């Protein structure tokens, strides 16, 4: 009497899921290769339907490779697996990660650099103020969702609803404000506090951090925004006393009421210095 023992064929189940939520994913194009690089099987993942491969060789190493990731995901690194000698179903899981957004704002403004005396003849004094562009610190922004920011798996709860506040950022000593690890999507930014001496930029700015492709792990928005400095305009209307008759030929002088300094704290114009002067001055306080 001779007994023949029959080996059961190996069975492997392969699933594709979201690394964070564990939800199984549709649309991933996958390939299994043997150790020589030959294609053993190819298919497209279907949600809640693990792909089954039978009769792989026990003890041989195989490679599960993602050729195309589902929309909204990054392509996963290869997964290597070896089949054991068992009739039980062996499971292999490949997890996909989602890209994240990085918002970087470089805030600039004009700073007084130097003052040049243009003319000093025939009683006339005039100065030229020259400015340089530099970084603005302590400028604060609120970041909002410009649309419903949805989870890539299509099942999990939305990250943010339209117009929901995402967070607040403030520029550092280098004029940089940034927010990272944002879910892919569209946002807008509002300036809520600006640096001393500058005009608040009240217009919302829109930022597109939408999904790019399966090979871009960080979607970056990096832009320079500039604030206008506050400016002063002086207009003098000379009238005759007790009447509204406008008088021509009035002569005025404009003086500093405090030391004028540059961004480094260096005094460029001392207090009570004439900025604009044509003969007899009438002092104006600004």
Segments from the language model and where they lie:
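Solvent-exposed loop/turn and edge beta-strand elements of beta-rich ligand-binding domains
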Residues: 1-279, 283-285
